[in-house]
């Protein structure tokens, strides 16, 4: 099976949708220049319910016209012409978009869901699309469209993942096969966000404190251990050593909180870290011999004895 769409529909024409449109419509892109004598030229169409509602909506329409993209503020029968639909609305509107598009889809059309949603929300979107005869593909965007445009890295999951990724990579995207289980790409992004947005919040708290103390440059230059082993391995090492050193680190965070308050910074994230470490201390899992466990062993101990929720 291979993909050869003639019409692509974009649901949502904000930062993501318009960036994808620019890539598809660029010189040398998927749409390319009209070919002489071609009775069925490749086309990009779009739907954005904010079209012409305000200054932003007016700008969306202007950009669509510049690119030669036929855009509408409503879900209309024009969607039935699309062989490939790319949904790039905000996560809270993903199901609404899927349900609005589903009755209009061409049978067998691929529906690429780029929305930031949970795995369960992805399942709801998928059921709406598949009930209408569409082929649902779960995609997690792992970078920003603002800097990367259509080349923002993506993880792709779904029953037709191989041909979809092959088509995407041949037409300007940067896509990677994750697997055949829809929802898994969305779940990867959600869990990754715990780290990335957490680091963002910590960075705000730490760097504001450092700047107020006049030591920002020095703090930024003392991250050599992270640079040396890479971020993912660094986080893994922290998890392993957390089993052994949670008590010492908990006490240290109490002093860190005091430092921030003395600097006039509310230790919001610091306080959460202190409570998180105290939770491990209270579980009493530190090994008597002080031996650092493997990552698998550490995760099992934390999951079974420290972190509740099920």
Q: Language-model segments: which ranges?
A:
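Short, basic/aromatic-enriched C-terminal tail that caps enzymatic domains
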Residues: 290-310
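NAD(P)+-binding Rossmann beta1-loop-alpha1 motif at the extreme N-terminus of oxidoreductases
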Residues: 1-80, 108
């Amino acid at each position: 099976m291979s993909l050869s769409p003639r019409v692509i529909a974009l649901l949502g024409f904000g930062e993501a949708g318009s960036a994808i449109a620019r890539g598809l419509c660029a010189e040398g892109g998927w749409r390319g220049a009209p070919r002489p004598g071609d009775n069925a030229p490749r086309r990009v169409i779009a739907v954005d319910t904010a079209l012409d509602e305000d200054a932003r909506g007016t700008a969306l329409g202007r950009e669509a016209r510049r690119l030669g993209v036929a855009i509408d503020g409503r879900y209309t029968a024009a969607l039935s012409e699309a062989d490939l639909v790319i949904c790039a609305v905000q996560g809270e509107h993903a199901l609404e978009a899927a349900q609005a598009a589903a009755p209009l889809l061409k049978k067998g059309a691929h529906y690429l869901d780029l929305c930031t949603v949970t795995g369960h929300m992805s399942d709801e979107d998928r059921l709406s699309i598949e009930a209408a005869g569409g082929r649902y593909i779960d995609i997690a965007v792992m970078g920003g469209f603002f800097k990367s445009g259509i080349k923002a890295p993506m993880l792709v999951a779904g029953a037709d993942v191989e041909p979809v990724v092959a088509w995407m990579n041949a037409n300007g995207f940067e896509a990677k096969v994750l697997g055949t289980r829809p929802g898994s790409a969305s779940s990867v992004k959600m869990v990754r966000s715990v780290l990335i947005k957490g680091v963002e919040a910590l960075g705000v708290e730490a760097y504001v404190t450092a700047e107020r103390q006049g030591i920002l440059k020095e703090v930024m230059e003392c991250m050599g251990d992270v640079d040396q082993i890479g971020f993912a391995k660094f986080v893994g090492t922290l998890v392993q050593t957390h089993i052994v050193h949670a008590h010492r680190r908990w006490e240290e965070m109490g002093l860190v909180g005091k430092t921030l308050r003395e600097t006039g910074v509310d230790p919001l994230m610091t306080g959460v870290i202190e409570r998180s470490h105290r939770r491990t201390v209270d579980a009493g899992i530190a090994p008597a011999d002080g031996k650092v466990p493997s990552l698998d062993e550490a995760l099992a101990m934390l999951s079974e004895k420290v972190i509740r929720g099920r």
